Amino acid sequence: MADLDDIKDGKDFGIGTPQTNTPYTLKGCGALDWGMQSRLARIFNPKSNRTVMLAFDHGYFQGPTTGLERIDLSIAPLFAETDVLMCTRGILRSTVPPATNKPVVLRASGGNSILGELSNECVAVAMEDALRLNVCAVAAQVYIGSEFEHQSINNIIKLVDAGNRYGIPTLAVTGVGKEMARDARYFSLASRIAAEMGAQVVKTYFVEEGFEKVTASCPVPIVIAGGKKLPEHEALEMCFRAIDQGASGVDMGRNIFQSSAPLAMLKAVKKVVHENMSAREAFQFWQEEKQGEGQ
């Protein structure tokens, strides 16, 4: 215990200087509990209120797809440069070194595969296990308009309720099935429903027309999915336009780890997201980094 012989009375109480409260300015998150805000502040850069997430959770329904055959060889070299890791608990425990010390968004839905109905998912992780893994958020798909729409919405509700008990945010991912639309009207509907159910963050797709309506009508931060592999200049253009139209970040997988220069691509995406670099400048940056890395 402290030495009781040398206790000095306090003198500097700042009389006349009111105590100020620092507001948490991430969209729609100002009234969340301290622990949840703290976790979100690790995901979203407090200076830009934006994030670059590296998604490599595809194996939970796709198996060892191109670029993810060996996480330890292809993805681990990218850990240091990304803001956030998005993966499953199996990969986290088996392949991600704890000393990586990056915030994790944990894939918490599953039970489906590319061989069956994609929307037929369940909650695949108990919140207590997410706590053991020290993650900053959990993620699940929501399939609006699908055969298992109600089930997927209920998955989000379960995660939100459990997350609220422990201070862990839920990221709802607007899944798109084989026959489902990919337009602003659909993604506005899906994103708004996810937010109304209590998701603190929504991941959705960028669309060429009306994306600003998707972000404006969603009361919480939206991060865009990278989607299918695009040429690097197109992927960077998509990033720039999404940020310019209100997105709070990107959650990219294939457009990074399937790039001919993944590390350079990740750095270029961060330039766009956090520094508002234009797509043209970012593509030039990628080319220079690619040459510098000998890729």
UniProtKB/Swiss-Prot annotation:
PANTHER family reported for this sequence: 3-HYDROXY-5-PHOSPHONOOXYPENTANE-2,4-DIONE THIOLASE, FRUCTOSE-BISPHOSPHATE ALDOLASE CLASS 1
Compartment(s) where it occurs, according to its Swiss-Prot or TrEMBL record: Cytoplasm
Positions annotated as active site in the UniProt record: K203
Function according to Swiss-Prot or TrEMBL: Involved in the degradation of phospho-AI-2, thereby terminating induction of the lsr operon and closing the AI-2 signaling cycle. Catalyzes the transfer of an acetyl moiety from 3-hydroxy-5-phosphonooxypentane-2,4-dione to CoA to form glycerone phosphate and acetyl-CoA.
Listed InterPro entries: Aldolase_TIM, DeoC/FbaB/LacD_aldolase, DeoC/FbaB_aldolase, FbaB-like, LsrF
Gene: lsrF
Pfam families: DeoC
GO cellular component: cytoplasm
Main location: cytoplasm
Stored SMART domains: DeoC
Alphabetized GO MF terms: acyltransferase activity, transferring groups other than amino-acyl groups; fructose-bisphosphate aldolase activity
Protein name according to UniProt: 3-hydroxy-5-phosphonooxypentane-2,4-dione thiolase
